């Protein structure tokens, strides 16, 4: 639950790897929803320079308005808003927002929000989860939570994205490449030897010698 909550709301959701939609096996949805709500309610909004703050403000007024438009879209398209929305805090704050009954065709499930918004989606099985997770224009990062290592590796190999974290969130290292598929990046990668190779060109030289 801690990883699930932080993966959606770290930095106020203003994070290119945020898990803004979370696909949960149908028998676990009710329990997961209750536990995630309890955790998110404990988040403290406030000054990002205050060590006790969990969620700061949106970066600009325009960005706050854009995130609020996604929240309104979720409500209009039939998702159930369990908590969140606009904040009475002075400045560009948005309360951490959680939706239930999110479906794949909704705007909040198809587009990147870059705000403190989490959509909970119910799936029948891993195959449906893989299909829904793959049906997006983006492909930077995904997270898989499971006790079945074979299923974890199958999902990690199958998901069309540059990084997959298993039972954690956004693990990374300066030595490992980071970048996305589809609209989440180019052929280039940050970090690792691949970050250097994008600035290099390869050359093949054939030399005919007298002894050959």
Please place each PLM-identified region on the residue numbering.
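ALDH superfamily catalytic-core signature
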Residues: 1-103, 132, 166, 211
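Conserved C-terminal structural/oligomerization subdomain of aldehyde/semialdehyde dehydrogenase
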Residues: 44-45, 71, 86, 93-212
């Amino acid at each position: 639950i801690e990883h699930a909550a932080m993966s959606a709301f770290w930095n106020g959701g203003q994070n290119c790897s945020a898990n803004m939609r979370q696909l949960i096996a149908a028998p676990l949805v009710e329990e997961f929803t209750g536990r995630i709500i309890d955790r998110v309610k404990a988040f403290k909004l406030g000054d990002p320079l205050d060590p006790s703050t969990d969620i700061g403000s949106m970066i600009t007024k325009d960005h706050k308005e854009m995130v609020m438009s996604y929240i309104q879209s979720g409500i209009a398209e039939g998702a159930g808003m369990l908590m969140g929305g606009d904040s009475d805090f002075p400045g560009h704050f948005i309360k951490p927002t959680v939706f239930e009954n999110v479906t794949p065709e909704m705007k909040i499930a198809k587009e990147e929000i870059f705000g403190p918004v989490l959509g909970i989606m119910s799936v029948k099985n891993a195959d449906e989860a893989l299909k829904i997770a793959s049906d997006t224009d983006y492909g930077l990062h995904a997270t898989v939570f499971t006790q079945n290592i074979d299923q974890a590796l199958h999902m990690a190999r199958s998901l069309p994205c540059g990084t997959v974290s298993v039972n954690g969130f956004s693990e990374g290292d300066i030595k490992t490449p980071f970048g996305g598929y589809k609209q989440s990046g180019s052929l280039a990668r940050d970090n690792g030897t691949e970050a250097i190779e994008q600035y290099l060109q390869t050359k093949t030289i054939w030399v005919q010698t007298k002894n050959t």
